[in-house]
Design a protein with these regions (language model features):
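Conserved small-domain helix->loop->beta segment predominantly found in fold-type I
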Residues: 271-274, 278-280, 285, 289, ...
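Short hydrophobic/aromatic beta-strand micro-patches
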Residues: 222, 344-346, 406-408
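PLP-dependent enzyme catalytic core of the Aspartate aminotransferase-like
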Residues: 78, 101, 119, 128, ...
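Active-site beta-loop-alpha junctions enriched in small/polar residues
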Residues: 156, 185-187, 322, 348, ...
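Well-ordered beta-strand positions enriched in small/hydrophobic/aromatic, beta-favoring residues
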Residues: 151, 219-221, 317, 343, ...
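Conserved PLP-enzyme active-site core in the AAT-like
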Residues: 2, 18, 80-310
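N-terminal "arm"/small-domain region of PLP-dependent enzymes with the aminotransferase-like
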Residues: 2-61, 69-70, 403
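Conserved N-terminal alpha-helix of the aminotransferase class I/II PLP-enzyme fold
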Residues: 39-91, 113-120
């Protein structure tokens, strides 16, 4: 279906014809733990990866399969793997690349959970990192070590929506024989497709814009299909014969889909962060309206940014659509249709004023999620990024008076009125 437009793909990929068993047009929920084999030879072929069909619900499910095919198509990848959460998608990706003493070069201004994973959790397993100013390519290149396994970035940084130059970073990564991993949770494939700019692996917290309604946890790993896993010798688990599958090389067995096949067959098999068919179904419902929702998110965001930029109680708005933002040129290059509905601003005053503003909002919900159809708010320094030191917070541009907004799809007049009411409460 690659000839179809995005809006058509988000509705049809993975179920181009009605369900063969029932003729249902909607994707069925296949609530089963396991699958019947035709005979012993059939079972052996499945377990030996000679026949790429269903074995057990921890590895594959037909509802999950539709979700994977759909997101892979929307991102322009060759294959995808859906897992239980965005954190699981990121963790599996980094474990697959970094095992046996690997090192990552990572964007400094990323989601606090990803920062904590790289800086504190993975080092306990022998995997290290260097955080860099992603806009300084000389600093990025200088951070690459002999054991570096990948460069890790986000299309829109969390929480300030800063934008890396994906094209340039991809060239740099490939110059050193490294894959570029891009978290496209905030960008979404509707606004930007990192694989088209040189990314090799794309990860998502599907909980956010893909699902879109704050109901369902899920994560997605998309394989771009073009990276040579055998060339450098740094990825033997993917390229070399695997003893737990009778010497199968995932590069030879799965071809362009080697990366996600390895994670499914080894890491998911052995650690089990499996997405449920019910969660996969709910995420598919969200994806069907992704383009429609993103257009409204972007439209509302433009108006909120303009409102805040000229508000007398606002010290600064951190949004790349503003002409004086340091990433404005990159925003125009990579996001011609808008975006960045998760961003921060700094209220005049300090933490007390920020908290009072947040506590007086009515439509905006104070919670840890983002990218919901509903508008959301949080104080990053005391919540999502509270594990960071004072210096780390400063490096990420998070101050005591920083407030993160996630602009929803409510009527813009109601959103602006709610913000103004909270400002008046702070006076």
């Amino acid at each position: 279906m690659s000839a179809y437009k995005f809006e058509t793909l988000q509705l049809h990929v993975g179920q181009e014809t009605p369900d063969p068993a029932t003729d249902a047009r909607a994707v069925p929920i296949y609530a089963t733990t396991s699958y019947v084999f035709h005979d012993c030879a059939h079972a052996a072929a499945r377990f030996g990866l000679a026949d790429a069909g269903n074995i057990y619900g921890r590895l594959t499910n037909s509802t999950q399969d539709v979700l994977e095919k759909r997101v892979a198509a929307l991102e322009g990848g060759v294959a995808a793997l859906a897992v239980a959460s965005g954190a699981a998608a990121i963790t599996y990706t980094l474990e697959a690349l970094g095992q046996n003493g690997g090192h990552f070069v990572a964007q400094k201004t990323i989601y606090g959970g990803s920062y904590n994973l790289l800086e504190h959790t993975l080092p306990n397993f022998g995997i290290t990192d260097t955080f860099v100013n992603i806009h300084d390519l000389a600093e990025v290149e200088a951070a690459i070590q002999p054991d570096t396994r990948a460069i890790y970035i986000e299309t829109l940084g969390n929480p300030n929506s800063d934008i890396p130059d994906i094209d340039a970073i991809a060239v740099l990564a490939h110059k050193h024989g490294l894959p570029l991993v891009v978290d496209n949770t905030f960008g979404t494939p509707y606004l930007i497709r990192p694989i088209e700019h040189g990314a090799d692996i794309v990860v998502h917290s599907a909980t956010k814009f893909l699902g879109g309604h704050g109901t369902t946890l899920g994560g997605i790993i998309v394989d771009g299909g073009s990276f040579d896993w055998a060339a450098s010798g740094k990825y033997p688990a993917i390229a070399d014969p695997n003893p737990s599958y009778h010497g199968v090389s995932f590069v030879k067995a799965a071809g362009p889909a080697a990366f996600v096949t390895y994670i499914r067959a080894i890491l998911l098999r052995d650690t089990g962060a499996t997405i449920s068919p019910f969660a996969a179904f709910l995420l598919l419902q969200g994806i069907e309206t992704l383009s429609l929702r993103l257009e409204r998110h972007a439209e509302n965001t433009r108006k909120v940014v303009d409102f805040l930029a000229y508000h007398p109680q606002v010290e600064r708005v951190n949004h790349p659509s503003l002409p004086d933002h340091p990433d404005h040129a990159l925003y125009e290059k990579y996001f011609p249709n808008g975006g960045g509905s998760i961003f921060t601003f700094e209220i005049k005053g300090g933490q007390a004023e920020a908290h009072k503003f947040i506590d007086n909002l009515k439509i905006f919900s104070l919670l840890a999620n983002v990218a919901d159809a509903k508008s959301l708010v949080i104080h990053p320094a005391t919540t999502t990024h509270s594990q960071l030191t004072g210096q780390e917070l400063a490096d990420q541009g998070i101050r005591p008076n920083t407030i993160r907004l996630s602009i929803g799809t409510e009527h813009i007049d109601d959103i602006l009125a709610d913000l103004q009411s909270a400002f008046e409460a702070v006076r």
